[in-house]
Amino acid sequence: KKSYFNLPKKFKYIDAITDIDTDLQSNFTLNLDKTYKMKNYNFSTQGKVKKVKIKLKNLSSNIVNMTNIDLVLVKDSELKLDLANKKRSINLTGKYTLDNKKYLEYNIKNNYNTKSSQLDLNLQFDKRVDLQLINYFKKDGIIANLSLNLELQKERLKINHVKFIEGDTQINAENVLFDKNKIINLKNLSIKTYNNSKLNNDFSLSLGKKIKIKGSQFDATNLPKILNKRDRKNSFSKMSKNIDIEFGSI
């Protein structure tokens, strides 16, 4: 049976959830005081998600150019959901596809309340990825592994860590802070990438009052063009233009 949900505005990246087929067991508890006023509540459910269709929106980035993604199909997944009056959590593990052909593995954990949200994500990803800043390109069909831990509070986003692995390519970042979609700080970024099987990036980077870049190889083909962009969506506009570089090859 087809189901449809209109989601709250805070789910700005999800437009609709449809075609839901699940086998779940749920439990609800409610505590009242002497005047029968609700003190707290808890709703929990767990079981199998046989299939679900998730329609996405507003997925765009000035940093990463990817294949357009507007629909996710999920199947053969395990769901555990806890909703309390002060905090909530979701744990979902199984398989997903973006093209209704190849299904890949994923795991999502989300803890959230009215003020903040923390997300742990681990998944396989086989769509195109174009990181213009470092001149790295991954073709459609090549599977990469992505792990991510982030915190969201109002208009501030903090990525505690992110790891992207595709073959010999590895990209790791720690403590990346965004304010209104602009990067304002990055503790450490280590990058090792290949272009046409040739090493084109092998360096570490930190962002603060200065941009510090150190390593043996850095593909700066697109860097001047990106840093000088003036459009409102430029994610790098709040970054320092003071760059300290120590390299063997640029």
Language model: regions and residue ranges:
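Membrane-proximal interfacial segments on either side of biological membranes
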Residues: K1-I250
